[in-house]
Amino acid sequence: MIRLALVEDDSVYRSRLREYIEKYSAASGEKFTVTEFSDGDEIALGYKAVYDIILMDIEMKFMDGMMAAEEIRKVDTEVIIIFITNSPQYAIKGYAVGALDYVLKPVSYYAFSQRLSRAIERVARRARHYLQINAHGTAHKLDTSSIYWVESNAHDLVYHT
């Protein structure tokens, strides 16, 4: 399941992108959980690293997409960002915040699906498996590829990484 954030201030355009996501899901069999935001500040302020892909408009009222991406990158360097914009001059700036790509409005379904496929391939390549380990009342997330061996000692497990 791909966790996707859709950040677009124009409700009509946000609906169109949502339809594209649903169409892509039906055609590819890929499942999405989509969270919609109507401005950059809604996603950036208090951002939690829970998304695989963010589709984000650049020109928005309160916080533009570039500023939102800068704030998001402070917390999450892994999330894939694809900018959707009317202005091609933002493309170079988009790469400065680690955007995977950008799409010019009006977005065709073909262009959208190509960018989304590329993003999903990147998500699949970085997919890892984690164990959640509770130690001394605190939950820890441990990447299974970092474990060398596990030792059992008097009903306790010791993970060697």
What are the functions of these language-model segments?
Residues 32, 58-60, 135:
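Short, flexible loop segments at the rims of nucleotide/cofactor-binding pockets, characterized by
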Residues 7-8, 37-39, 54:
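Conserved sequence signature across two-component system core domains
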Residues 10-35, 74:
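Two-component/phosphorelay signaling modules centered on CheY-like receiver
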Residues 114-161:
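Conserved binding/recognition cores within well-folded domains
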Residues 1-5:
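Non-catalytic signal-transmission and effector/linker regions of two-component phosphorelay proteins
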Residues 36-42, 65:
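Helix N-cap/capping motif at the beta->alpha junctions
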Residues 45, 51-125:
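CheY-like receiver
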Residues 8-9, 86:
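Acidic di-acidic motifs
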